[in-house]
């Protein structure tokens, strides 16, 4: 139980803290370092899993394949506006491999695919958003596996959560501060994208 708390604290506390500190302290000038911190913090739970010998090479290969499929899916569907299968792949990884793997799949999909689409100050937010979706899918795996309707609702809400977290970045991007009315305006403006 203590290891699970440590793992979750890295993913739920340290990763968002790194993203927020990166935005507040470095503005948009050091996003590469913030992305590196997010990547390293997201690997700590996996390293702790190695310590228990719960991870084998088969799981690592499957994780690598899921990340590769997510990156390829994002690239192959890039010509279709507002449709990317990344969230679905991250949710599948979280449900069937565990929350640590789901977080890593989400975070590394954003990091690696942005080598194609362009790295920027939004990358740490994408890493955290997709990672959080994988983490939540892993934590709710038993419920999501039992009922297809709940899984479909979760998938839709995961897309909304991703958009919501990216709207936080958009609000920061304007002038480096959080302005609640601007944040609401960003959410309202993004509704056509969010519901697709």
Report each predicted region and the residues it spans.
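Membrane-helix interface segments
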Residues: 56-59, 99-104, 144-149
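Generic transmembrane alpha-helix motif of multi-pass integral membrane proteins
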Residues: 44-48, 86-102, 136-140
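Alpha-helical transmembrane segments in multi-pass membrane proteins
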Residues: 65-70, 94, 98, 105, ...
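Membrane-interface starts of transmembrane alpha-helices
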Residues: 82, 86, 101, 146-154
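Interfacial aromatic-anchored transmembrane helix boundaries in multi-pass membrane proteins
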Residues: 71-87, 107-141
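Membrane-embedded alpha-helical hairpins and interfacial helices in multi-pass inner-membrane proteins
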Residues: 2-38, 123-129, 135, 139-196
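Transmembrane helix interruption/hinge and helix-loop junction motifs
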Residues: 26-30, 97-102, 118-120
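Hydrophobic transmembrane alpha-helices
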Residues: 2-91
